[in-house]
């Protein structure tokens, strides 16, 4: 695989730069606002010393080419990054960057909270595989351990699904909760989480999207209990939206159900609205957290879920987040872009904008987050290339971008400070009604989101872009591509025969989670033994180093 060099902008004259900027940016498109903070050809981990790193590589405990970052979250001076154990050789799945020590560049990932807590297969004490994570306003880090090692047909399940919550002040785990068997099924794959804080930190709920088991799981912090909503067709994929095109690779993820989720600010009734989308879909759905917080509604809530309009073509999304003033950001994986929508506006393509797009740096923007200071963080990882072809490890493959939210949405349809869009309109979930006919419902199910919006909003204005140079040193083409109208063809060139030819159905990172009552393979280079070492084993490598300490070297590294 290679990346085509777009060239610097120094050779462009002022006139040609202006022409490029004007012709390449659509009316809803922002212009190179995300700033690259960190980047890697391949991931590296902060081993205690060089000798242990060499031993880990020699033994297969660390295989750099097998590590792919998928989740990002920011808190204080730490930027958390998750690395699932899809392949052997992943020494830690929950890691962070000390941003005081590494302002930019390609920093080593530090296991969080320490090496021992990242021991695969040590179910009660460690995290085997983490995907997307969430920091709440109470300073807690929520991590769902899927308990899996491997990908597709290679998946094993050393541990059950478990919610892990860490106090980020003390860096200690303060809660571990195993999902009961009733909350999962043989196809369960949970890779996303949303956290809902109510009137105080104890009034907290987490929601988990079961992408391949087609369900939505609620967990109550106060009750330390969970329950599952699984009887809704909105959790399922759209059979017409299972075809994907990313980085020049055509593939089918037609089985991908509910995935991306976001929560609105608390509404006047004291609850939030959860928005969600199946991955194989271009449509968004909504439900009040009043329903999700009520265990008695798991079988009687069909009409409380609401369908919104489609986003438009090439609009698959895996990650979404909403600010406390109602701006939703979401990745657009087919378009190498990050989109936006203001939740006070109708959910229609007219009111969707693109805050940034990059056919090199944003190939598969896997995760999007907004931190407590309203800074946006975006992680891109070229995931389909990693899964279906070969990454070129002489090229930059993984990037983390950041920008203030206000900067990203400025002069887009999501910026309500622009009076041309008219005053905001309140959009709310329909109230629960009692027995009897339900207004607006037909015999076939719930209606589309058809609230009347007043005042009538004018057509989105055209946005003019000046000749100021972009923040990055290349200008990716955003025009029509050879793939047809609206088709995005990335400038990343890949081979397509190392795993399978492009265009065929390929296994994604899903599992068949049947932990209860079954035996699973728990050996291999990806698992560290949990027994204390004998005296003769001291100095025997990373495994021994981890097991010889109650806590890892993280504290020394952090204080250093």
Swiss-Prot record:
Carbohydrate-modified residues: 153, 224
Intracellular or extracellular location(s): Secreted
Signal peptide as annotated in the record: 1-30
Compositionally skewed regions (Low complexity) per UniProt: 471-480
Positions of region (Disordered): 452-492
Keywords: Developmental protein, Glycoprotein, Secreted, Signal
Gene Ontology annotations for the cellular component aspect, listed alphabetically: extracellular region
Domain of life the protein comes from: Eukaryota
Record-linked InterPro entries: 6-blade_b-propeller_TolB-like, Royal_jelly/protein_yellow
Function: Controls the pigmentation pattern of the adult cuticle and larval mouth parts.
Family stated for the protein in its record: Belongs to the major royal jelly protein family.
Alphabetized PANTHER family for the sequence: PROTEIN YELLOW, PROTEIN YELLOW-RELATED
Name of protein: Protein yellow
Organism from which the protein derives: Drosophila pseudoobscura pseudoobscura (Fruit fly)
Encoding gene (name): y
């Amino acid at each position: 695989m290679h990346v085509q060099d777009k060239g610097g902008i120094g050779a462009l004259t002022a006139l040609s730069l202006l022409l490029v900027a004007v012709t390449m940016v659509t009316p809803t498109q922002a212009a190179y606002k995300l700033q690259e903070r960190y980047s890697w050809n391949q991931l590296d981990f902060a081993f205690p010393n060089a000798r242990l790193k060499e031993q880990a590589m020699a033994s297969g405990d660390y295989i750099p080419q097998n590590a792919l970052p998928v989740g990002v979250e920011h808190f204080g001076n730490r930027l958390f990054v998750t690395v699932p154990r899809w392949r052997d050789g992943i020494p830690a799945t929950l890691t962070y960057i000390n941003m005081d020590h590494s302002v930019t560049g390609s920093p080593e990932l530090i296991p969080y909270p320490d090496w021992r807590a990242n021991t695969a297969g040590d179910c009660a004490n460690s995290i085997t595989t983490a995907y997307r994570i969430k920091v709440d306003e109470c300073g807690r880090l929520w991590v769902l351990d899927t308990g899996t090692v491997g990908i597709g047909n290679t998946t094993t399940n050393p541990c059950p699904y478990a919610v892990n919550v860490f106090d980020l002040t003390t860096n200690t785990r303060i809660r571990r909760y195993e999902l009961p068997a009733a909350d999962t099924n043989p196809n369960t794959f949970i890779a996303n989480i949303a956290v809902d804080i109510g009137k105080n930190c104890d009034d907290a709920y987490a929601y988990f999207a079961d992408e391949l088991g087609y369900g939505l799981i609620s967990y109550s912090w106060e009750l330390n209990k969970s329950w599952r909503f699984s009887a809704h067709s909105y959790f399922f994929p759209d059979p017409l939206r299972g075809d994907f095109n990313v980085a020049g690779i055509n593939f089918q993820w037609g089985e991908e159900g509910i995935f991306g989720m976001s929560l609105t600010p608390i509404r006047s009734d004291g609850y939030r609205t959860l928005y969600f989308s199946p991955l194989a879909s271009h449509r968004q759905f909504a439900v009040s957290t009043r329903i999700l917080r009520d265990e008695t509604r798991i079988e009687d809530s069909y009409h409380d879920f609401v369908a919104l309009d489609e986003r438009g073509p090439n609009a698959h999304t895996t990650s979404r987040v909403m600010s406390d003033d109602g701006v939703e950001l979401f990745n657009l994986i087919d378009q190498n872009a990050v989109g936006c929508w203001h939740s006070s506006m109708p959910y229609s393509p007219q009111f969707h904008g693109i805050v940034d797009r990059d056919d090199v740096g944003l190939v598969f923007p896997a995760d999007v987050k907004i931190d407590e200071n309203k800074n946006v963080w975006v992680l891109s990882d070229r995931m389909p290339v990693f899964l279906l072809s070969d990454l070129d490890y002489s090229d930059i493959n993984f990037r983390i971008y950041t920008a203030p939210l206000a900067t990203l949405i400025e002069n887009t349809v999501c910026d309500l400070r622009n009076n041309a869009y008219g005053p905001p309109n309140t959009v709310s979930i329909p109230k629960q009604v009692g027995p009897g006919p339900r207004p607006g419902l037909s015999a076939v199910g719930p209606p589309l989101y058809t609230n009347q919006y007043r005042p009538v909003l004018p057509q989105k204005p055209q946005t003019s872009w000046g000749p100021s140079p972009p923040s990055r040193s290349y200008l990716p083409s955003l025009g029509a591509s050879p793939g047809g109208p609206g088709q995005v063809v990335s400038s990343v060139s890949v081979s397509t025969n190392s795993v399978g030819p492009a265009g065929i159905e390929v296994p994604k990172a899903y599992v068949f989670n049947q932990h209860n009552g079954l035996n699973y393979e728990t050996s291999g280079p990806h698992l560290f033994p949990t027994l204390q070492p004998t005296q003769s084993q001291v100095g025997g490598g990373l495994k021994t180093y981890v097991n010889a300490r109650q806590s890892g070297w993280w504290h020394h590294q952090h204080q250093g």
